[in-house]
Amino acid sequence: MKQSALVNPASMKGHYDNFHFAAAARSSDLLICSGQLGVGPDGRAIADPAAQFAAAFEGVRAVLAEAGLDFSDVLEITTFHVGLTQHLGAFMRVKDSVLPAPYPAWTAIGITELAFPGCLVEIRATAQLRKPAARAAAAKPKAQAKRAARPAKKKAARRR
């Protein structure tokens, strides 16, 4: 696989170097994201389930952002749960606060354990890559906001 097809946010470089997997890979018009866990900066599972779920979604968000995408580009998520029925309500509240309508396809799978002790969920996602024109259109409002925020002095100097 070409290195250019891989997506690895700087914050996840350690995972790539230590565990030998990419955060995501581009394939045709899809971004296929590796599973994200709800761990803190120390690499340990976050104790509070809702905070852990939010951190796992934040990991997905970081991978999407590195590829120029956001949650509105997600087509499908698969979630792997330790204690699925015990934590499903809390997970759904977090999921619904993060994923916008129209909602992506979702499969939730109950499992006995994850790679990191104490982790309750791993979230993997598949997203639709944007065509270059769509990326430019998405960036346009940001560029317009930057131009509007420029000091009036510069605008006056250009008029002279």
Task: Describe these PLM feature segments.
Residues M1-L75, H81-R160:
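N-terminal presequence-like segments and the immediate start of the first folded domain
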